[in-house]
From Swiss-Prot:
It comes from Delftia acidovorans (strain DSM 14801 / SPH-1). This is Chaperone protein DnaK. Keywords: ATP-binding, Chaperone, Nucleotide-binding, Phosphoprotein, Stress response. Signal peptide: none annotated. GO terms for molecular function: ATP binding; ATP-dependent protein folding chaperone; unfolded protein binding. Acts as a chaperone. Induction: By stress conditions e.g. heat shock. The lineage of its organism: Bacteria, Pseudomonadati, Pseudomonadota, Betaproteobacteria, Burkholderiales.
Length: 648
């Protein structure tokens, strides 16, 4: 069985890790980085770019470059958080037929799970390249405060990417696994995980206990905000720059999509720089132009100004911390360690606020960008049976219940209940001779059902005629270890039963998922063809270069017919290289190698006469350069021109 990889599917950046024995390894991607930007770009020719390459071209292709898709996953178009993002994002967010928030790219509508699947596919490929074997199974992390619809949508993204998602695990819990695994302290420890990422905030209170030599990680409580993160901090900087520029130049950059994309990059860069310095310059020449000519932007931003811009955002993280402490039944003084997760926790003001609330310095020995992926890899090892000394007890973040008479939310499973769990309760009818009941399932903490998130509904029909209150209808809730809910209803008298696995009352249908899986497979096949074409082209170009060089140096040794044949073969290959036909390029490369054999023989003979066997061997190697280039295909060696451009 192959390894189960751990993936941190982040709003801003993603990361993949594996367990190698008892050692964790975060895997570098093809660009050599340990994290990959969660950015996807759709090119005019149909090519899909993921990660750093997508980020690099965002300024010139803002409408077709998707970032922060995780903020939309499992959400309805009408939700206020989505409506807020519509005004901020350069790409188009539209309503799908099922009411979900989807994204429009180059004339087609894409579901957020479909977009996130591109990032997951990149993570999968990164792991496969490192392991040298196919990867089909993964543990994927989600914010602890993700609801059922968002968790289901994340699983769908995994399926579309060709992964069997063995477990959905909460990000703070994964970070706790990464932190606690190598700690040798005896006795129980209570830790707080403060996770402020690119798009979401979570806090979890977790107890790590030694139980008969086994490390038990029990989540006592969790809380958070799934629409608060680094993207919001960036937006505050962008808004500030727009306001200042309008004051100075009288031009509103908010209406210029290309300028906004440059501002986003500059804001993120400034935010990162201000974690280490007191002041930074935001310098964007030719940001826009009007009738008077081009306009340049140059603004100084100090750390104190940034802190004043985002003060309320940082403050918003404290209320969930307070609630999590209360729900866990502990006091702040009971917390032994505070762990910071997510890139935003590098901001000094955030660290200061966390210290102020918890009364102690947060730990510095956890990598905020990598801990979540490492914890997911640990859980993968547990699920594969390769690790027996870890037990993870997670919780459901929000209460689950059904709507009863008068629109009341009757809670079946309360928040912070350890999962997996089951609960059943008996209900009855509201009217005489009622033949059916509709079970509406909600998630949330409000007393009235309408104030909570509706997850789904189904009917139980065929109830025998009886006075109101007489029929006995048992409703059962069953939450699995992924936090995904199954609900059933059964009439005890007739034995009639109905059940559903709760997806969003919209979500992706099975047919839609299967279509997306097929599309993804076609894309993978297309990518493979493109790679093979590039390899063939590289080898063809190497052959042309090698033969032309040798012809220039030794062509006078050939008779006219031989030289003409080689020149003709070179011309044919150069013509083939202009096209997209890999087979034609391969054939012309082979033809050139055959035609240039005489040239190789002449070079060998000349060298042997001049300097003996060693020189002859070197000459032969030079003449055979084209052949070697073609043979390299078998060894998966690709010649490529690489040019590094460094920006100040």
């Amino acid at each position: 069985m192959g390894k189960i990889i751990g993936i941190d599917l982040g709003t801003t950046n993603s990361c993949v890790a594996i367990m190698d024995g008892n050692t964790t390894r975060v895997i570098e991607n093809s660009e050599g980085a340990r994290t990959t930007p969660s950015i996807i770009a759709y090119q005019e020719d149909g090519e899909i770019l993921v990660g750093a390459s997508a980020k690099r071209q965002a300024v010139t292709n803002p409408r077709n470059t998707i970032y922060a898709a995780k903020r939309l996953i499992g959400r309805k178009f009408d939700e206020k958080e989505v409506q807020k993002d519509i005004d901020l994002m350069p790409y188009t967010i539209s309503r799908a037929d099922n009411g979900d928030a989807w994204v429009e790219v180059r004339g087609q509508k894409l579901a957020p799970p479909q977009i996130s699947a591109e990032v997951l596919r990149k993570m999968k490929k990164t792991a496969e390249d490192y392991l040298g074997e196919p990867v089909t199974e993964a543990v994927i992390t989600v914010p602890a405060y993700f609801n059922d619809a968002q968790r289901q949508a994340t699983k769908d993204a995994g399926r579309i990417a060709g992964l069997e998602v063995k477990r959905i695990i909460n990000e703070p819990t994964a970070a706790a696994l990464a932190f606690g695994l190598d700690k040798t302290d005896k006795g129980d420890r209570k830790i707080a995980v403060y996770d402020l990422g690119g798009g979401t905030f979570d806090v979890s209170i977790i107890e790590i206990a030694d139980v008969d030599g086994e490390k038990q990680f029990e989540v006592l409580s969790t809380n958070g905000d799934t629409f608060l993160g680094g993207e919001d901090f960036d937006q505050r900087i962008i808004d500030y720059i727009i306001t200042e520029f309008k004051k100075e130049q009288g031009v509103d950059l908010a209406k210029d999509v290309l300028a906004l994309q440059r501002l986003k990059e500059a804001a993120e860069k400034a935010k990162i720089e201000l974690s280490n310095s007191a002041q930074t310059d935001i310098n964007l020449p030719y940001i826009t132009a009007d009738a008077s000519g081009p306009k340049h932007l140059n603004i100084k931003l100090t750390r104190s100004k940034l802190e004043s811009l985002v003060e309320d955002l940082i403050e918003r993280t404290i209320a969930p911390c307070r609630t999590a402490i209360k729900d866990a039944g502990v006091s702040v003084s009971d917390i032994d360690d505070v762990i910071l997760v997510g890139g935003m926790t590098r901001m000094p003001k955030v660290q200061e606020k966390v210290k102020e609330f918890f009364g102690k310095d947060p730990r510095k020995d956890v990598n905020p960008d990598e801990a979540v992926a490492v914890g997911a890899a640990v859980q993968g090892q547990v699920l594969s049976g390769d690790r027996k000394d870890v037990l993870l007890l997670d919780v459901t973040p929000l209460s689950l219940g059904i709507e009863t008479l008068g629109g009341v939310m009757t809670k079946m499973i309360t928040k912070n209940t350890t999962i997996p769990t089951k609960f059943a309760q008996t209900f009855s009818t509201a009217d005489d001779n009622q033949p059916a009941v509709t079970i509406k399932v909600f998630q949330g903490e409000r007393e009235m059902a309408s104030g909570n998130k509706m997850l789904g509904e189904f009917n139980l029909e065929g109830i025998p005629p009886a006075a109101r209150g007489v029929p006995q209808i048992e409703v059962a809730f069953d939450i699995d270890a992924n936090g995904i809910l199954n609900v059933s209803a059964k009439d005890k008298a007739s034995g009639k039963e109905n059940k559903i696995t709760i997806k969003a009352n919209s979500g992706l249908s099975e047919d839609e998922i299967q279509k997306m899986v097929k599309d993804a497979e076609l894309n993978a096949a297309d990518d493979k063809k493109k790679l093979e074409l590039v390899q063939a082209r590289n080898q063809g170009e190497a052959a042309v270069h090698s033969v032309k060089k040798s012809l220039g140096e030794h062509g006078d040794k050939l008779d006219a017919g031989e030289k003409t044949a080689i020149e003709s073969a070179v011309k044919d290959l150069e013509e083939a290289l202009k096209g997209e036909d890999k087979d034609a390029i391969d054939a012309k490369t082979t033809a050139l190698m055959t035609a240039s054999q005489k040239l190789g023989e002449k070079m060998y003979a000349d060298a042997q006469a001049a300097g003996g066997p060693e020189a002859a061997a070197a000459a032969a190697a030079g003449a055979a350069g084209a052949s070697a280039g073609a043979a390299a295909a078998d060894d998966n060696v690709v010649d490529a021109e690489v040019k590094e451009v460094k920006k100040d």
